[in-house]
């Protein structure tokens, strides 16, 4: 049966489908007096089935094993009863009285149907090529043509906005006596200044609608107004709004819209949002969820032994826009992150605090990697960012010098990698000006002399439509400063459409950007509208991304080249051509799990009454973790959305659900190996095994 038809079945129609397609299963259920007998008879049936040891047979046995158990669901911290097959028995014997969606029984139908079907054929290279090429990029001429008209419309609106501003002290104001044409030309010139976009950013639904040509629906406007009344921050620059397509024809901009327009679920839950990443919750004197002791405040986040995140008390606590699926929405809700720029300028106390934060890195035995983020690292002014990098440099010098007095086996890890986390290459590429490039170049030159070997801008392009001529120029400048750029994608519904991610990899690779992570959306209710089931991520990994896979030797050779060449873009283009690859599959598809970190190693152990899969995750065995990992072991997560609900959502976006029909089969995942570029270099000495700043007692 076609996916579209199955997704529309009623419960009674679905019951008839079971009787027609899976008569043996129905017979076992009818002959079983209760759920326990059903599971026992099902166990016997599976044991004698010719496919007992294939993936389908193993999956059914796992569902039998966990039925009737309770597991601790880590994200909500509650006990969760599992009764997947007990519910199926009730359904097949006419005892199911609940008014419910069909999603649970559709998924179970697919699992039992797998016992009788051969393994599906994977899509061909030509098929994936066709699916990839349907997605335009911001470098395409027809896209640029629409955006030129958008820009002109927005420029006119900005002239009117400036005319009505009551702040003559602003650097962006009109002198008396200017004609409209002169004002328009002046605004056109200011467009190239990132400060203009921050000053003119949209902060209200009404203004947003005006800059989008009054194209938003009444329903959307009502929702955004409700969000504003609840105190949700709203911030979108004129540049980013010019990327949206308001014409009703041309390119599909859903991947852009879903990032700046809030869903009903997000608005409804705002105010009660919890931190998904439990290690982000810091209490003075107490270890975080990963067992790390951290300085007071919320400036350092840490999960792994080798790396910690630094969030400065500067404008770096703001962003160039608020992403609807932001992992730090919890911090925006608590006002630790915000868009009130005047309040975010560094205070006199920041320099003193920065020295204390640097001491944490300096005195830690294992830290060798610092990720400066926020907010957004590049939102800090050039001078402020330069001061932060200077502090990092001085800390690294002191740590290296102190090691000279320590014997072999007791030396501390020295700083090897510096990263800046920023979405501004996509949100506001004008920020990448000559002053910033010079700061980055100078820091790399001097830091390279003290053992720091990797300098990375960790950016976030969500769709090839964000890769504009301005973004391409910003990327070129950053690469020219000697820093590598890698990309992290959030695999929301719009980005998960077939071929979309392969196209993004392709476009970014051509410009010299290496893809790093493809993140599943966190599974709390506020993200329900944009959540993509992990099964789709595994499907993408095994069916689409496989055409860019590198051999271990090729991956090593490429990482060596990227660490030495002056032109990463030319290097990657040559590599792709030589190895006949459409893109580089260097990113890992993962979910950021509460406390234990990134992983895609899971098994499905049950399904909720709503059809949401219950996944048992294990940690990523390819990297070092906090010792607390031995105590946590495997963890359980309920997904935010059923597979059936996800497919219906894709259909509503114009997708053919049949293109995704193998998604049901992906009930287990395995975390991919890291691209060798991201492995830490060996030290020319032996460091201590002792972990400092650890407390996992209790």
Task: List each model region and its residues.
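Radical SAM enzyme [4Fe-4S]-AdoMet core and its adjacent flexible, acidic
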Residues: 2-19, 23-30, 39-50, 67-68, ...
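Flexible, acidic/Gly-rich N-terminal and inter-domain linker regions that tether
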Residues: 2-304
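C-terminal accessory regions of radical SAM enzymes
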Residues: 236, 542-698
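N-terminal pre-triad scaffold of radical SAM enzymes
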Residues: 236, 292-331
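Catalytic or ion-translocation cores adjacent to nucleophile or general acid/base/metal-coordination motifs
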Residues: 302, 313-317, 331-342, 421-422, ...
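Glycine-rich, often proline-containing surface loops adjacent to acidic residues and nearby aromatics
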Residues: 304-308, 322, 364-373, 418-421, ...
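Conserved alpha-helical substructure of the radical SAM core
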Residues: 318, 329-370, 383, 387-388, ...
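Conserved AdoMet/S-adenosylmethionine-binding subsite of the radical SAM
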Residues: 355-362, 378-551
């Amino acid at each position: 049966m076609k996916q579209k038809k199955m997704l529309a079945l009623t419960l009674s129609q679905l019951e008839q489908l079971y009787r027609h397609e899976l008569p043996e299963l129905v017979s076992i259920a009818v002959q079983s007096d209760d759920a326990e007998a059903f599971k026992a008879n099902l166990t016997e049936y599976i044991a004698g089935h010719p496919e007992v040891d294939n993936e389908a047979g193993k999956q059914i046995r796992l569902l039998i094993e966990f039925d009737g158990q309770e597991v601790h669901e880590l994200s909500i911290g509650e006990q969760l009863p599992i009764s997947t097959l007990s519910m199926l028995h009730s359904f097949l014997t006419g005892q199911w009285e609940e008014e419910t969606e069909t999603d649970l029984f559709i998924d179970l139908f697919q699992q039992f149907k797998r016992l009788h079907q051969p393994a599906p054929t994977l899509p061909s290279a030509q098929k994936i090529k066709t699916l990839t090429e349907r997605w335009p990029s911001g470098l395409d001429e027809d896209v640029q043509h629409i955006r030129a008209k958008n820009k002109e419309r927005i420029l006119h609106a900005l002239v009117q906005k400036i005319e009505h501003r009551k702040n003559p002290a602003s650097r962006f104001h009109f002198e008396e006596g200017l004609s409209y044409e002169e004002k328009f030309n002046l605004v056109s010139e200011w467009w190239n200044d990132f400060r203009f976009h921050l000053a003119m950013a949209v902060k209200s639904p009404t203004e947003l609608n005006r800059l989008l040509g009054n194209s938003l629906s009444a329903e959307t406007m009502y929702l955004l107004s409700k969000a504003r009344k609840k105190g949700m921050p709203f911030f979108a620059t004129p540049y980013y709004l010019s990327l949206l397509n308001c014409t009703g024809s041309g390119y599909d901009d859903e991947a852009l819209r879903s990032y700046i327009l809030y869903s009903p679920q997000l608005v409804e839950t705002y105010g009660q949002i919890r931190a998904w990443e439990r290690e982000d919750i810091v209490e003075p004197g107490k270890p975080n969820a990963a067992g790390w002791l951290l300085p007071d405040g919320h400036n350092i986040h840490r999960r792994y032994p080798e790396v910690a995140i630094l969030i400065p008390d500067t404008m770096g606590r703001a962003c160039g826009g608020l992403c609807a699926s932001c992992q730090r929405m919890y911090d925006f809700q608590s006002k630790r992150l915000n868009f009130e720029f005047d309040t975010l300028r560094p205070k006199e106390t920041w320099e003193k605090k920065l020295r204390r934060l640097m001491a944490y890195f300096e005195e830690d035995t294992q830290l060798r990697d610092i990720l400066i983020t926020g907010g957004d690292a590049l939102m800090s002014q050039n001078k402020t960012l330069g001061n932060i990098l200077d502090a990092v440099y001085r800390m690294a010098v002191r740590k290296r010098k102190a090691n000279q007095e320590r014997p072999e086996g007791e030396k501390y890890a020295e700083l090897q990698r510096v990263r800046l986390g920023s979405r501004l290459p996509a949100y506001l590429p004008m920020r990448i000006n000559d002053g910033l490039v010079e700061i980055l170049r100078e820091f790399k030159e001097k830091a390279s002399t003290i053992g720091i070997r990797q300098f990375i801008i960790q950016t976030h392009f969500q769709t090839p439509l964000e890769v504009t001529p301005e973004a391409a120029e910003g990327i070129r400048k950053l690469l020219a400063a000697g820093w590598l750029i890698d990309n992290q994608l959030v695999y929301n519904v719009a980005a998960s459409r077939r071929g979309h991610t392969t196209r993004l990899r392709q476009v970014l690779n051509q410009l010299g950007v290496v893809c790093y992570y493809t993140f599943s959306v966190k599974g709390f209710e506020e993200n329900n509208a944009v959540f993509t089931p992990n099964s789709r991520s595994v499907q993408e990994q095994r069916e689409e991304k496989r055409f860019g896979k590198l051999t271990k030797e090729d991956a090593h050779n490429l990482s060596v080249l990227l660490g030495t060449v002056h032109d990463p873009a030319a290097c990657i283009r040559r590599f792709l051509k030589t190895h006949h690859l459409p893109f580089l599959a260097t990113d890992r598809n993962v979910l950021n799990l509460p406390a234990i970190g990134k992983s895609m190693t899971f098994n499905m152990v049950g399904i909720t009454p709503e059809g949401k899969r219950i996944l048992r995750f294990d940690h990523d065995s390819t990297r070092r973790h906090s010792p607390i990992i031995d105590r946590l072991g495997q963890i359980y997560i309920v997904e935010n959305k059923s597979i059936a609900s996800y497919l219906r959502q894709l259909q509503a976006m114009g997708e053919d659900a049949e293109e995704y029909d193998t998604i049901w089969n992906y009930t287990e995942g395995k975390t991919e190996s890291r691209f060798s570029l991201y492995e830490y270099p060996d030290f020319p000495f032996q460091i201590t095994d002792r972990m400092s700043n650890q407390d996992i007692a209790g």
